[in-house]
Amino acid sequence: DYLLHYMRQQRCGYNPFLKDSCHVHDGYIVYHPTKTGQHIDVRGGWHDATDYLQYTTTSANAIYQMMFAYQENPESFGDAYDAAGHPGANGIPDIVDEINWGLDWLNRMNPAPGELYNQIADDRDHAGMRLPNKDLVDYGYGPGKGRPVYFCSGEPQVRGEFKNATTGVASTAGKFASCFALGAKILKDYYPEFAAEIEAKADAAYQEGVKKPGACQTASVLSPYIYEEDNWVDDMELGAM
């Protein structure tokens, strides 16, 4: 339970530590063959680090690790916070609240079959210290008015003055599939309608990985530093379980 303090602190969309909202205009699609420039509602999730980028690859890993911990030791987790992350029990284990927070965001990052998104924002975020509710970085949509949302195109995307080494979609698709499949089992007793929704999406996400094997790396605009994931087989194996 102690580690969940950190997860609540990292929440995006609404942050219970600040008792304020942030990044509520996210975001605008990039790299999609027909939807680039359109708005997509991808509020929620967690900030990746001390910056405010958000990645499917790291968020899905965090979600799955929490789900696995709860699945193996459900009696180890208490209920001292509500779903918004405020003090006060709500009848749901706090770790399940946090799992649900993450899965809600992951669901937004997969709005339709074959439409998977890998990342919100990029290293243009690295523009000085500020709290998330004071983030006014301008990505071309106006200061603080929305950030880019990177579509899993399966093709190389920007990496500073270079391109990343993306070869497919499977590494990300497998993560969606595994999180949705296990998440549906864990949430069915608490959020049955949402559990059914993500359960239906699990196979579609997996099939997208089958169609587009390969690794889906993250993107950067100003520097060459990214998550250089090059393995995708393990993600698809977990998604198939």
Predicted regions and their residues:
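Low-complexity, Ser/Thr/Pro/Gly-enriched N-terminal "stalk/linker" regions
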Residues: 1-61, 97-164
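Conserved long hydrophobic alpha-helices within structured protein cores
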Residues: 57-68, 206
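Hydrophobic packing residues in well-ordered alpha-helices of helical domains and bundles
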Residues: 55, 92, 99, 195-198, ...
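Active-site lining segments of carbohydrate-active enzymes
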Residues: 39-49, 117-230, 237-241
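Well-ordered alpha-helical scaffold segments within catalytic/enzyme domains
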Residues: 63-86, 104-112, 175-192, 235-241
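Acidic, glycine-anchored loop motifs typical of Ca2+
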Residues: 84-95
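Conserved, well-structured interaction surfaces
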Residues: 52, 56, 68-78, 162, ...
